[in-house]
C-alpha cells in the first residue's frame, strides 16, 4: 500500500506535488539529504509515538531530537517510540519511508517548530527511496497538523 497510498493521497489533495523516487535509498536523514541535495535539518522526519493508549506522529527537522521534558510539558505524559512492526501497522509505511500522507486511519499529527526555519522541507513518501518537496506551512495544512515545540 505505502507508496501507492501516498500517491493516491497527493493526487486527491495536492495534485501539483510530485513524488521523487531515487535509485538509491533515502531511508535515513543523511541518505535522504544526500539524495535530495539538501542539508540534513531540511529533511522532515516522521516519528511514530505512543502516549498512553494514543498513537501519534510528530514531524520534525532531520537533525532535531525529541526533548522528553518539552514533550511531557506539552502532552502531559512521556512518549514511547513505536517498534518497526507497529509503525507499519499504523502507517502502512516502512521505517525509513514513514510520512504523514496516505495513512490507513486518521492519527493526530504534529509538526515541530524545528521545521519552520525552512521554506521547503523534504519528507519521505511511503517508501525507503521516495520523497516530496513541500512548503513547510503546506505540509502542516495538508495533514491537519498542529504546531508544537517538542524537540531540541
Language-model segments: what does each one mean?
Residues 1-152:
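Extended, low-hydrophobicity, polar/charged segments
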